[in-house]
Amino acid sequence: MIHQTGFWHKDFAEPHHIHSPNVSKWICEFLSDKKNNQIYDFGCGLGNYLNDLHSNKFTKLIGLEAEPPKTDYEFKINSQNLAHPFILDEKGIVICLEVGEHLPKEYQDVFLDNIANNCSDYLITSWAIKGQGGYGHYNELNNDEIIPEILKRGFTYLPEKSNEVRLVVEDFCSYFRNTLMVFKKD
């Protein structure tokens, strides 16, 4: 089901992953002038957000998932445990939704360092707040706890953009209204 480092085994992931079409549309519009930039989705699950980007003519897309799903997408989903250090061949924009809270606290720094070391532009992320609950939430943190952790890794928080994306969230994934955050790499 859920690995000790927080990733979901693929058979467990399929029925439990939630995709927000409104958030995905917002991401496509927000990044509309970055269609030829490298974009990664860390902990991409089934690859739904990347698939929406691909449908909107984004060209350089790679998903990272510890146990990649079998798909017929025209982009790659590579096997990568986010709790272990890694450097990708090219830095890029990073999307990382509903991932950090699934890693036990002991892997938090490596996970955040992986994001920082592989991001060259925007980071669009979320982190479940304390008390939110959810399958395999080992490390829920309030915004005022996780934002400084990301800032100290060379990012600037973009509160206006964060609030903008939170406003489009559908009711079935209302937790995103408290957890979505947008950053820019310094």
Predicted features by range, described:
Residues L97-H102:
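Short catalytic micro-motifs in class I SAM-dependent methyltransferases
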Residues D121-I124:
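Short glycine-centered segments of the SAM/dcSAM-binding site in methyltransferase folds
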Residues M1-K91, I95, E106-N118, I129, ...:
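Conserved N-terminal segment of class I S-adenosyl-L-methionine
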